[in-house]
Design a protein with these regions (language model features):
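N-terminal hydrophobic targeting signals that begin at the initiator methionine
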Residues: 1-2
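Anionic N-terminal interaction surfaces
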Residues: 5-72
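Short polybasic amphipathic segments
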Residues: 69-74, 116-120
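Short aromatic-glycine motifs in intrinsically disordered, low-complexity regions
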Residues: 72-85
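Acidic, Ser/Thr- and proline-rich intrinsically disordered linker/docking segments
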Residues: 94-169
Length: 169
């Protein structure tokens, strides 16, 4: 059976286009991750700390200096960059605030997440809570894209650190 040379060239052309698309998407994501890590390191540098554990997604990053027990957070939005940090020694508890609202349409009711925050409750009750804004429908779009899983992961990590810190006192 003889294969048409034109079909082979066409197939190779589409394979090349397909491959280039995925390579460009990968490189774009890696570039954004590096930019997020630069912002996170800048936040850590403010107090001469270093990021030893981190995650980035979209325009958001969270990290920790595991030696100093400080958590860092950065987020890029149209309004500018947000950089926050919280010392675990000053934290009583970490929790997730998942602020939702219910809407209706002809298909029935559905729930939308308006905000998703990682909230730090301070040991000193005179100080207010600090929140890391993982997701806000106003500037992140209408759908969560992994923010809830990241919030759950980091809430668990931070609470384990808080428990360890309290036991070592």
């Amino acid at each position: 059976m003889k294969i048409d040379q034109g079909k082979i060239i066409t197939a190779l052309f589409f394979l090349l286009i397909f491959s280039i698309t995925f390579i460009l998407l990968y490189l774009s994501r890696r570039k954004r991750e590096k930019q997020n890590l630069v912002l996170l390191n800048r936040e850590a540098d403010k107090n001469n700390l270093r990021v030893s554990k981190f995650n980035t997604w979209g325009n958001t990053s969270i990290g920790m200096d595991e030696t100093a027990n400080v958590v860092f957070f950065t987020k890029k939005t149209a309004d500018g960059d947000t950089g926050l940090q919280m010392a675990i020694a000053e934290t009583e508890k970490c929790r997730i605030d998942n602020i939702k609202r219910t809407q209706s349409n002809e298909d029935g009711n559905y729930t939308l997440t308006e905000k998703l925050e990682l909230v730090f409750e301070p040991r000193d009750k005179k100080k207010g809570e600090m929140a890391f804004p993982f997701f806000n429908m106003a500037y992140d779009g209408a759908m969560l894209t992994g923010e809830l899983q990241q919030a759950e992961k980091w809430c668990r990590i931070i609470n384990e650190r808080i428990t360890g810190f309290a036991q070592n006192k």
